[in-house]
Amino acid sequence: TLFPYTTLFRSVKFANILPVKKGLGDSETQAVMSDDDSYTLGNAILTNGQTGSAVEITTVDAFVRDQRLARVDFIKADIEGYERHMLRGARETLARFAPKLALCTYHLPDDPEVLETLIKEANPAYEVVQKRKKLYAAVPQK
């Protein structure tokens, strides 16, 4: 799990979940995120005068490579309209491992079309189902 908030680090109690203090995007960079842990509505938009902390942004592909992951089975993302950027940074992973996907499609008006296109460009074998503003994708087993 990649997520920038301190609360997550305190609350995760599962042995098979490792919180990583990074965000996901289409390039390796930095972003400024709010330090206010009381704000847990799913996003951290900074307005004029607010301060925050620098958070490292990586790609799914770079993370998989750096961690030498032998498999990736599932990617779930509700990242406030940044799903398309995450998918652009996951092309190699989608092509190589074909993980099942569960993504939100309600943040931007063209999310349903854009996200499906990005997935199928990375791996044309994916079958996509969209319902209730969610996108589910998997490569059928042979």
Regions of interest found by a model, annotated:
Residues 1:
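A detector for short metal-coordination/catalytic motifs
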Residues 4-142:
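Phosphate/nucleotide-binding beta-alpha loop and adjacent structural elements of enzyme active sites
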